[in-house]
Design a protein with these regions (language model features):
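Sec-type signal peptide cleavage vicinity
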Residues: 2-381
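Long, compositionally biased low-complexity segments
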Residues: 347-349, 354-356, 362-388, 392-394, ...
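Short beta-strand element of the conserved SAM-dependent methyltransferase core
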Residues: 22, 81, 87-95, 101-109, ...
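C-terminal, surface-exposed recognition/capping segments
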Residues: 403-527
Length: 527
């Protein structure tokens, strides 16, 4: 994660024209004739762009990861200017003379007197009613990807000093005081899933204090804590757009956040319009410092912990079960196709015994592999298995929903059972657990092992899901070319003799020996 300037201190120039006498009236009249519709006798602040076009305000025009950001004025913006009496006056009219150059805007004030060498200017957000209070919204909405059009209404703010120039005009340069986060979600490796799901909202949760609310702005700096409506949560509603396969600017999302050091968790809500199934993906962002006037970029690998359960193989085969015949793969119970693997085909099962050697998925020392018998015993004994009749999972490129079990992720099992893992030599692949926490190496011989686990009915909440993953027991398996769906599904282990089977009608899971016949089962690396 990197930070960068939103807008430098040399961000915006504005000219103040005090309308006194005929000459000033002529100036206003000329502006009106140009279609700017400024009221007569108004004090006009003309926001002028400097040589570099990105030094403007207030809607995001463009942002590239790791670089400065260009923003523009909107016709709905207004500023507050402190008059000769020390009272902040609100601009009543905002005009952008040239739609092609929104870096230049006119602000008309009809109240107050402005004759000093300097006048304080503040911007407290779109539709603000106070020059001394800013509200960073807990509910923010982005209607288009890579658009910060909600910048002003979500809590942006800034200060400046307008200085009188020899020609009688006043100019100021705005300094931003809110902080900003840019999120780049992506879905890698699963092209079908990427095309089928949409991002509906992002929720940022702080465990270290408020990140939104109403803040005192009387000193020109946001107060350290909210004075009202404090919130540890910011919800950004997104436009339900596609999620990119890479970190890209055109599919990014923005939020205003209170400056400071925050420990954050992000929840990404995705939905599949075809199946009407939704799922939340939770990521801990850690502790980050958000600086006034700067963006913090955050990348998010949405599907990193989403397992796709239709990676079918015969045991230790080099190619997937339906490789080359994906278009005719049967998915309905009882249907079949004759193009299933035959002897001599790379899709056919390996004839060796023990652990796999042909396919990394079946090789225990590979970075991503189906569970070994030893690893499976840790899931059974210490995985806190929980039943769920409506868990969301990924199958055939879509989000689906059905019965299955939640397990603790292996990293959580290790953390919760550090002493037991140490007693097993620190390697759960090398030594498993038996009932009564007795150590047992299930890969040492070929006797049949009946590992049982009975899931509880404990509800797995959204917050729990950061430490758990869902295994569906309702997806098909293949015997030859026939699609079978029974009370429970089966999954491969690295050892040819065993598979992991689930019977959902009595909530038991067990392993059993390899039956006769060519089987196509999911080869799933568990988390």
């Amino acid at each position: 994660m990197k930070t960068m300037n939103v807008i430098k201190a040399t961000m915006l120039l504005a000219t103040v024209l005090v309308t006194v006498g005929c000459a000033s009236d002529d100036t206003i009249e000329n502006e009106q004739q140009a279609g700017n519709k400024m009221p007569a006798h108004a004090v006009v602040f003309s926001g002028e762009n400097e040589a570099r076009p990105e030094y403007t305000r207030t809607t995001l025009s463009s942002h590239a990861k790791g670089s400065e950001t260009a923003v523009e004025w909107e016709a709905s913006d207004h500023v507050w200017v402190k008059d000769d009496a020390g009272t902040y006056q609100k601009s009543m009219v905002t005009v952008i003379p040239n739609p092609q150059n929104k870096a230049f805007a006119l602000f008309g004030l009809t109240n107050g007197s402005f004759t000093g060498a300097n006048h304080s200017v503040v911007y407290t957000g779109k539709n603000s009613t106070s020059a001394t209070e800013v509200e960073i919204k807990a509910e923010q909405t982005q209607t288009v990807t890579n658009s910060f059009a909600h910048l002003g209404e979500s809590g942006d703010c800034g200060v400046a000093t307008a200085t009188k120039k020899p020609d009688g005009t006043y100019r100021f340069k705005l300094e931003h005081k809110a902080a900003y986060i840019c999120i780049y979600p992506r879905i890698e490796e699963h092209d079908r899933l990427q095309k089928n799901v949409r991002l509906t909202k992002i929720v940022l949760i702080s465990s270290s204090g408020p990140i939104a609310g109403k803040y005192d702005f009387s000193t020109g700096t946001l107060g350290s804590t909210p004075t009202g409506d404090a919130s540890n949560i910011i919800t950004l509603t997104t436009p339900s757009g596609e999620i990119s396969t890479a970190t890209r600017v055109d599919t990014s999302y923005y939020a205003v956040i209170a400056p400071g050091t925050h420990t954050l968790r992000a929840k990404y809500y995705i939905t599949d319009p075809s199946t009407n199934v939704s799922k939340v993906v939770i990521k801990d962002l850690g502790t980050m410092t958000f600086t006034s006037g700067k963006f913090t970029d955050v990348t998010a690998w949405i599907n990193k912990d989403l397992i796709e359960y239709n990676s079918y193989y015969a045991w230790d085969a080099k190619k997937p079960y339906w490789y080359g015949y994906e278009s005719v793969q049967p998915f309905t119970t009882g249907t079949s196709n004759p193009n299933y693997p035959q002897p001599g085909d790379e899709r056919y099962e390996a004839s060796t015994w023990g652990d796999g050697i042909n396919n990394p998925l079946f090789t225990p020392n590979a970075p991503r592999h189906v569970p070994t018998m030893n690893e499976l015993s840790w899931y059974f004994m210490k995985g806190d298995a929980r039943w769920d009749s409506n868990g969301a999972y990924v199958f055939n490129g879509h989000l689906q929903q059905g019965r299955g079990v939640w397990f603790k992720k292996m990293e959580r099992i290790k953390a919760d059972n550090a002493s037991l893992v140490a007693g097993a030599g620190g390697d759960v692949k090398a030594m498993g657990l038996n009932y009564g926490d007795a150590y047992h190496d299930y890969s040492a011989n070929h006797s049949v092992y009946m590992l049982y686990a009975t899931p509880s009915n404990t509800i797995t909440t959204e917050e729990d899901q950061i430490n758990y993953f869902f295994v569906p027991f309702c997806i098909p398996v293949y015997a030859g070319g026939v699609c079978l769906t029974r009370d429970g599904s089966a999954y491969w282990t690295t050892n040819r003799e065993y598979m992991f089977h689930a019977l959902t009608h009595d909530l038991e899971m067990y392993t059993f020996g390899y039956p006769e016949g060519i089987l196509g089962l999911p080869a799933v690396p568990m988390l």
